[in-house]
C-alpha cells in the first residue's frame, strides 16, 4: 500500500481515510523501508495533509499505542503540537497542574524538546517528577494523584520505525501533529495548541472525527500555540461532533496586554523556576497567560460554563495553593514508584 500511497500523494491526490490507515499500519509494523517512509512524509508535507489522512493515521496509531489504564474518567490533556518557534516557557505543562488542582484528572502526554530549548518531559524532570513511568505506573499515578505524565517514547513503541527518516529529512512532518491526537490514556477532552492558523480547523475536525467529548484547538497571536496576551487568538471548540470557530481576546476578560517576549523561556532549570513561581502565586503576564489557557481546560473538563468563570476558578486554584500542591504530590508519588522499583530488585 505504501508504494501506491507515495505515487498518489506525489501526484497531488489525497488519500482516503482507509488508505491512510492501511499506509500507517505498514509503517508502524516495520513493513515500509526508511526510503519509503521519508518519501511519503516529504510528499505529504508538500501536498498538505488533509482531514481524512490525519484521521486515518491517528486511528492506526491509536491501535498501536501501549494503553494506560485508569479508573479515572473524563480525562483532560493539554498536549499541543509545539513547533511555533517562539521558545516560550512550558505553558501547557503549567496549565496541567491548574486543571489537576481543580479536580480534573489530567493525562499529560508529552516528550522531550523538539523545537524549543525545553520540552514538557525536560521541565518536569527539573521540577523533580520521574517522567519515565511504565504504563502500569502511569495508570496508578492517575488513580492516586489525579495527574500523570505519559512519556511518548515509552508508550508509542511502533513509532521507532519512523524515527530515523524523520530525523534525516529534517522537516516538520505529519508525526508532529499526530502526538496530541494519540493520547495513551485516550483523554476525552483536550486543549490542543497548534503552530499554524491553517492547521487549527483541520485538527478540530480530526478531533471531531475521532470522537472527542469536548476540546479546544488554539492558535494564538504571533503564531503561538497558546493564547497569548499579545492579541486575539483563533480558537475552535469541538463538541458533540460539531466544530465552532471563535476569536478570544484576553483584554475582553480584564487581562492586560503583554508582548510575547514576556513569555520567553530558557533551559529546563529556568522554565521550572518560572512554573514554580507562577504556581506559588507570583503575579504578572506569565500568570495571566496560564490562567486564560487553563480556563479553556476547565471548560473542556466540564467544571465551568464559560471563560470568565474559568478565569476566576483558575485564579482561585493557584492562589489557594491547589495547583502547587498537585505538583508536589506528583513529584512525591512518581519518586515513590521509582523507589518501589529499586526495592523489587
Swiss-Prot record:
Anthranilate 2 binds at residue 166. Mg(2+) 1 binds at residues 92, 226. Keywords: Amino-acid biosynthesis, Aromatic amino acid biosynthesis, Glycosyltransferase, Magnesium, Metal-binding, Transferase, Tryptophan biosynthesis. Binds 2 magnesium ions per monomer. Anthranilate 1 binds at residues 80, 111. InterPro entries: Anthranilate_Pribosyl_Tfrase, Glycosyl_Trfase_fam3, Glycosyl_Trfase_fam3_N_dom, Glycosyl_Trfase_fam3_N_dom_sf, Nuc_phospho_transferase. Its cofactor is Mg(2+). GO terms for molecular function: anthranilate phosphoribosyltransferase activity; magnesium ion binding. One of its GO terms (cellular component) is cytosol. Mg(2+) 2 binds at residues 225-226. The keyword Transferase applies. Its EC number is 2.4.2.18. GO terms for biological process: L-tryptophan biosynthetic process. Pathway: Amino-acid biosynthesis; L-tryptophan biosynthesis; L-tryptophan from chorismate: step 2/5. 5-phospho-alpha-D-ribose 1-diphosphate binds at residues 80, 83-84, 88, 90-93, 108-116, 120. It holds the Pfam family Glycos_trans_3N. Gene3D superfamilies: Nucleoside phosphorylase/phosphoribosyltransferase catalytic domain, Transferase, Pyrimidine Nucleoside Phosphorylase, Chain C. Homodimer. Catalyzes the transfer of the phosphoribosyl group of 5-phosphorylribose-1-pyrophosphate (PRPP) to anthranilate to yield N-(5'-phosphoribosyl)-anthranilate (PRA). This is Anthranilate phosphoribosyltransferase. It comes from Desulforamulus reducens (strain ATCC BAA-1160 / DSM 100696 / MI-1) (Desulfotomaculum reducens). The gene is trpD.
Amino acid at each position: 500500500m505504501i508504494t501506491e500511497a507515495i505515487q498518489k500523494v506525489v501526484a497531488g491526490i489525497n488519500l482516503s481515510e482507509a488508505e491512510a490507515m492501511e499506509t500507517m499500519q505498514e509503517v508502524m509494523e516495520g513493513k515500509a523501508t526508511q526510503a519509503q517512509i521519508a518519501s511519503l512524509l516529504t510528499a505529504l508535507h508538500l501536498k498538505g495533509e488533509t482531514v481524512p489522512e490525519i484521521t486515518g493515521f491517528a486511528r492506526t496509531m491509536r491501535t498501536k499505542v501501549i494503553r494506560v489504564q485508569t479508573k479515572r474518567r473524563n480525562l483532560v490533556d493539554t498536549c499541543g503540537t509545539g513547533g511555533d518557534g517562539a521558545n516560550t516557557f512550558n505553558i501547557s505543562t503549567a496549565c496541567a497542574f491548574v486543571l489537576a488542582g481543580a479536580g480534573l484528572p489530567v493525562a499529560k502526554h508529552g516528550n522531550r524538546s523538539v523545537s524549543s530549548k525545553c520540552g514538557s518531559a525536560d521541565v518536569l524532570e527539573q521540577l523533580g517528577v520521574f517522567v519515565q513511568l511504565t504504563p502500569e505506573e502511569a495508570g496508578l499515578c492517575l488513580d492516586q494523584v489525579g495527574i500523570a505524565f505519559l512519556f511518548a517514547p515509552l508508550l508509542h513503541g511502533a513509532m521507532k520505525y519512523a524515527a530515523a527518516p524523520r530525523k534525516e529529512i529534517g522537516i516538520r512532518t505529519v508525526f508532529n501533529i499526530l502526538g496530541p491526537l494519540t493520547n495513551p490514556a485516550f483523554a476525552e477532552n483536550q486543549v490542543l495548541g497548534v503552530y499554524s492558523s491553517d492547521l487549527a480547523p483541520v485538527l478540530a475536525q480530526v478531533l471531531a472525527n475521532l470522537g472527542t467529548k469536548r476540546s479546544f484547538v488554539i492558535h494564538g497571536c504571533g503564531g503561538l500555540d497558546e493564547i497569548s496576551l499579545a492579541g486575539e487568538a483563533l480558537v475552535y471548540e469541538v463538541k458533540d461532533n460539531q466544530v465552532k470557530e471563535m476569536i478570544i481576546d484576553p483584554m475582553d476578560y480584564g487581562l492586560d496586554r503583554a508582548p510575547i517576549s514576556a513569555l520567553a523561556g530558557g533551559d529546563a532549570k529556568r522554565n521550572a523556576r518560572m512554573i514554580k513561581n507562577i504556581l506559588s502565586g507570583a503575579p504578572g503576564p506569565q500568570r495571566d497567560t496560564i490562567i486564560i489557557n487553563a480556563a479553556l481546560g476547565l471548560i473542556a473538563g466540564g467544571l465551568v460554563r464559560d471563560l470568565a468563570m474559568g478565569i476566576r476558578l483558575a485564579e482561585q486554584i493557584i492562589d489557594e495553593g491547589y495547583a502547587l500542591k498537585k505538583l508536589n504530590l506528583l513529584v512525591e508519588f512518581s519518586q515513590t514508584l521509582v523507589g518501589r522499583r529499586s526495592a523489587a530488585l
